[in-house]
Regions:
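A compositional/biophysical signature of low hydrophobicity enriched in polar/charged and small residues
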Residues: 1-70
Length: 70
């Protein structure tokens, strides 16, 4: 996820309030925060990202990757 300059700490604090967010890590490089979201199905995860995470002040972009079992 990318956030606006100066918003990393605020975004992480707000992510911690979301039940489906299991972990969040500020990182360096091309993205600002890596977020682990869990849910019973893809629809729940999508709703969490679109309705809850995208509404956090400072969030400018998300990119979703889904883990698939081998």
């Amino acid at each position: 996820m990318n956030v606006q300059a100066g918003f990393v700490e605020l975004v992480v604090r707000n992510l911690d309030k979301i039940e489906e967010v299991k972990e969040s890590f500020p990182v360096t490089g091309g993205i600002d925060i890596i977020v682990k979201v869990e849910g019973p199905d893809v629809e729940t995860i999508a709703k969490t990202i679109l309705a809850k995470i995208h509404s956090i002040e400072g969030v400018s972009r998300t990119e979703t990757h889904i883990v698939v079992p081998l």
